[in-house]
Regions:
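Active-site neighborhood of phospho(di)ester-bond hydrolases with catalytic His/Asp-centered motifs
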Residues: 1-2, 6, 28-35, 80-81, ...
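Short, active-site-adjacent cap segments at secondary-structure transitions
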Residues: 39, 120-121, 161-162
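Extended active-site neighborhood of metal-dependent phosphoesterases/phosphodiesterases
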Residues: 11-107, 111, 126-136, 140, ...
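Short acidic, glycine-rich surface-loop motifs adjacent to enzyme active sites
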Residues: 1-4, 106-127
Length: 229
């Protein structure tokens, strides 16, 4: 999410898409709806996103973003719209009904969910005092993902670098078998959901790590901890 800073201005899309044409002409880009892609800072930015990406989407209200799914090989990807809620409301029933149906009918070996606002993050939107949306998403989605065996959740918004342990029902870490190959430690088919915050793709690194439950995380750092090429 947050494909561009100001989605209502075509100049931002040209800068992002045209300057990176060599990449985008060869590598598919499957975006989720971020707050900068819709009415925040952008007028009705959701319509601008539709003009620049061509996705097959289910029938839905798209005033504040969009949701969809696709399969690639043995992986089912489910792309959620977290602009569909506020600090005072849950994800709407229309999207939740679609989401549970997608999870029920999944036959692929792996299931990956992608969303903009995080459930678990050491940043201000996941662990700070104003993290009401993260707490709502956790209450609404965490057990659902564990129940249906979601393997990985990719999160944005906080610009941090973090990885949780595999989490089961009740947001509790589950036992995992680990194996080291060529000096790299792997979790072997863990029976829980791993939540990853993979940092910003641009230059907005964030440094402040907020108080969080260390028992849930394998790694939790500010994105300034990484060296960007």
């Amino acid at each position: 999410g947050d494909v561009v800073e100001w989605s209502r201005y075509e100049s931002y899309w040209r800068y992002m898409l045209d300057d990176n044409f060599g990449y985008f002409s060869k590598i598919p880009t499957m975006a989720v709806s971020g707050n900068h892609d819709t009415t925040y800072k952008s007028g009705d930015g959701s319509s601008e996103t539709f003009k620049h990406f061509n996705y097959a989407m289910p029938t839905q209200s798209t005033a504040y973003g969009f949701y969809y799914s696709y399969s690639y090989g043995d992986v089912k990807f489910i792309m959620i719209n977290t602009n569909d809620l506020t600090a005072a409301s849950d994800l709407k029933a229309e999207q939740m009904k679609w989401l549970e149906n997608e999870l029920k009918k999944t036959t692929e070996k792996w299931t990956i969910v992608s969303l903009h606002n995080p459930l678990y993050s050491p940043g201000k939107w996941g662990s700070g005092p104003n993290n009401a949306i993260a707490r709502q998403l956790t209450a609404q989605l965490s057990d659902l993902f564990a129940e249906y065996g979601v393997d990985l959740v990719l999160q944005g918004h906080d610009h941090m670098i973090s990885k949780t342990k595999p989490l089961g029902i009740g947001s509790l870490p589950v036992h995992e078998t680990k194996e080291t190959i060529d000096g790299v430690e792997y979790s072997v088919d863990p029976k829980g959901t791993i939540y990853v915050m993979n940092g910003p793709a641009g230059n907005q690194a964030r440094t402040e790590v907020y108080p969080h439950d260390d028992s849930l995380y394998d790694y939790a750092e500010g994105s300034d901890a990484c060296s960007w090429a």
